[in-house]
């Protein structure tokens, strides 16, 4: 997902997306431990999406306090 899509999402939507991404990351970690995971590139995509959503949320939080 592109950073522009994250910025267009509402804060509530970003929180929900963040929860879902973290759940998916945990599920992939379990699959990896069990040897069932075939798509290891998904780990980096999920980590980057989590970082992007946190970046947008923190930027909004900072701007809200300064404004």
From Swiss-Prot:
One of its GO terms (molecular function) is structural constituent of ribosome. HAMAP family: Ribosomal_uL29. CDD domains: Ribosomal_L29_HIP. It comes from the Bacteria. GO terms for biological process: translation. Keywords: Ribonucleoprotein, Ribosomal protein. GO terms for cellular component: ribonucleoprotein complex; ribosome. It comes from Wolbachia pipientis subsp. Culex pipiens (strain wPip). Belongs to the universal ribosomal protein uL29 family. This is Large ribosomal subunit protein uL29. The lineage of its organism: Bacteria, Pseudomonadati, Pseudomonadota, Alphaproteobacteria, Rickettsiales. Pfam families: Ribosomal_L29. InterPro entries: Ribosomal_uL29, Ribosomal_uL29_sf.
